[in-house]
């Protein structure tokens, strides 16, 4: 085969050795791994690609040092060529980055230059507006300055006129009054006129000391006059009082003198009738009425009471509500402890930052009630309790009730009871207060309800045992208002070998009839836990529940799933002599033997 024939054949590609292939694959894996780690896309940011490919050739990098050494060791003949390629690659990348930074800077500068004409127009327009405002301000300042100058000029002219008016108008050349022109130049005539004026001055001075008094003296005389008039009024009142007493004693003397002379033969009642006839004959109406009056100081007391009322109204008008409340509480005969005074305080309403005036009034009158040895009436008591509870002052109401400063009534207890039902936190204290009031009023049923709601079941049982007014209907109402299992259990159990206070059967039937099925179910559940002997004793010892009603209870047990209890009750009922079960479809007449 010739050389030409050999050259005409296709050239085969160089065969890559296994080591070269592994080396290239390791470099490719590094590039792929770094690209994925950075998160570059195929069209991703060039900066990140530059960094990755540069690290491939960076022989000073710690992570890629082994790779580049392998390349150099593997192809040591191309070391200078690879180094040159790397430098050229780095220079190319830096040139591209620098070009980008320059383009970004120039682009921003171009935008600024493009906006300069618009900004210039805006600045010029703003300068024109400010110049217009400055002209307006200057014009206003000029006008104000002109007004100030005019006012100064007017003030100067006014001061000049005032000086001219205040100038002395005395004229020395005016002739002397009472003298002619010739006498005014004559020395003797002038001496005589001087002596005349001196005598006149002395006389006027004497007249001032005798005929005139100063204004201070007049004020002193007026005060003395008022004192004398008050003394006169007091003397006149004393005179009238003594005249009245004299007339009264005279009437008594005219009547009793003959009676004493007759050795008191006439009864004293006839003497009193004569005094009354004296009233009709002589017209001594006021005198005779005063004789039979129990309180001789009634007029003085009326004056004192009137003064108290006026003083109270003054305190209200001045806004001194605390002093007014104390004044009303200490008023004589409690004239200010009434509903009209309460309405005055109620009309004031609430004052921000101060206690309620109405509460101050009630607090004052309740605190002084023991001083009068008589509690406040029922109407004011209820209003006071309402006021205290509305202001959330249960502590005050507790103090009033426990210290017996109130008039206890059923309505007062109901108010406190209702407040406790609405406010769960204060319910125990309200129930205790209501119980005190109900006990004082003799309302044992409501007091019993308060005990039960407080959970004092044993005290309630003792209360029922001691009270004779509580009957079965009252107990039914009690368990309706307070459906507690412990209460019903105690009421339906025997105590000291005595029958229970309430029938168990009636209690169960009542619970189911008033939509308290849960309570009735719990009662049946407790009974079903007992043995048949206990159930039989319960049925047979129940004197108030008939056998027909126990059959109703058995039907209720069957309807609610207590089948065993149903069977026990029915077997107990069937075991009774003369008792037979009648079905609903049976038409047998029970009273047939009576009519035939």
From Swiss-Prot:
Coiled coil is among the record's keywords: yes
Entry coiled-coil feature ranges: 129-241
Keywords linked to the UniProt accession: Coiled coil
Gene3D superfamilies: 1.25.40.30
UniProt superkingdom: Eukaryota
Pfam families linked to this entry: Clathrin_H_link (PF13838), TSNAXIP1_N (PF15739)
Signal peptide start-end: none
InterPro entries on file: ARM-type_fold, Clathrin_H-chain_linker, CLHC1, TSNAXIP1_N
The name this protein goes by in its record: Clathrin heavy chain linker domain-containing protein 1
Designated gene of the protein: Clhc1
């Amino acid at each position: 085969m010739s050389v030409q024939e050999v050259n005409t054949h296709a050239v085969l590609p160089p065969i890559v050795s296994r080591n070269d292939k592994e080396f290239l694959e390791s470099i490719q894996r590094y590039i792929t791994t770094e690209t994925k780690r950075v998160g570059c896309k195929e069209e991703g940011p060039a900066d990140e690609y530059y960094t990755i490919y540069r690290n491939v050739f960076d022989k000073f990098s710690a992570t890629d040092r082994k790779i580049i050494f392998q390349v150099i060791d593997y192809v040591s003949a191309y070391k200078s060529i690879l180094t040159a390629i790397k430098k050229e690659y780095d220079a190319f990348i830096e040139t591209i980055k620098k070009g980008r930074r320059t383009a970004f800077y120039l682009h921003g500068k171009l935008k600024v230059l493009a906006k300069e004409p618009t900004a210039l127009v805006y600045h010029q327009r703003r300068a024109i507006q400010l110049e217009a405002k400055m002209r307006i301000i200057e014009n206003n300042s000029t006008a104000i300055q002109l007004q100030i100058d005019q006012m100064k000029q007017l003030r100067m002219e006014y001061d000049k006129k005032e000086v001219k008016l205040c100038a002395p108008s005395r004229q020395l050349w005016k002739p002397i009054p009472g003298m002619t022109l010739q006498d005014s130049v004559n020395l003797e005539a002038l001496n005589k006129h001087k002596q005349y004026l001196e005598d006149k001055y002395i006389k006027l001075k004497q007249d001032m000391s005798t005929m005139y008094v100063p204004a201070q003296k007049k004020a002193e005389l007026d005060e003395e006059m008022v004192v004398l008039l008050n003394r006169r009024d007091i003397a006149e009142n004393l005179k009238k009082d003594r005249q009245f007493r004299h007339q009264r004693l005279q009437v008594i003397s005219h009547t009793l003198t003959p009676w004493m002379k007759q050795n008191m033969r006439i009864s004293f009642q006839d003497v009193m009738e004569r005094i009354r006839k004296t009233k009709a004959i002589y017209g001594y109406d006021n005198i005779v009425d005063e004789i039979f009056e129990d309180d001789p100081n009634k007029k003085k007391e009326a004056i004192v009471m009137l003064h108290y009322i006026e003083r109270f109204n003054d305190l209200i008008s001045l806004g001194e509500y605390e002093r007014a409340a104390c004044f009303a509480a200490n008023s004589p005969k409690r004239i200010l402890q009434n509903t009209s005074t309460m309405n005055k305080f109620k009309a004031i309403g609430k004052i921000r930052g101060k206690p309620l005036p109405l509460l101050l009034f009630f607090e004052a009158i309740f605190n002084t009630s023991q001083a009068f040895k008589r509690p406040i009436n029922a109407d004011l008591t209820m209003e006071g309790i309402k006021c205290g509870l509305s202001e959330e002052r249960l502590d005050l109401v507790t103090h009033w009730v426990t210290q017996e400063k109130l008039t206890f009534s059923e309505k007062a207890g109901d108010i406190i009871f209702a407040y406790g039902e609405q406010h769960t936190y204060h319910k125990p204290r309200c129930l205790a207060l209501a119980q005190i009031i109900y006990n004082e009023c003799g309302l044992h049923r409501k007091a019993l309800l308060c005990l039960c709601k407080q959970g004092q079941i044993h005290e309630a049982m003792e209360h029922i045992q001691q009270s004779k007014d509580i009957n079965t209907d009252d107990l039914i109402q009690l368990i309706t208002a307070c459906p507690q299992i412990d209460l019903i259990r105690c009421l339906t159990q025997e105590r000291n070998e005595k029958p229970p206070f309430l029938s168990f059967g009636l209690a169960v039937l009542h619970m189911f009839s008033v939509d308290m099925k849960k309570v009735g179910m719990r009662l049946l559940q407790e009974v079903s836990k007992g043995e048949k002997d206990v159930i039989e004793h319960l049925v047979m010892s129940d004197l108030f529940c008939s056998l027909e009603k126990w059959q109703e209870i058995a039907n209720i047990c069957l309807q609610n799933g207590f089948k065993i209890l149903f069977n026990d009750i029915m077997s107990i009922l069937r075991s009774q002599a003369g008792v037979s079960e009648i079905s609903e479809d049976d038409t047998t007449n029970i009273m047939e033997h009576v009519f035939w």
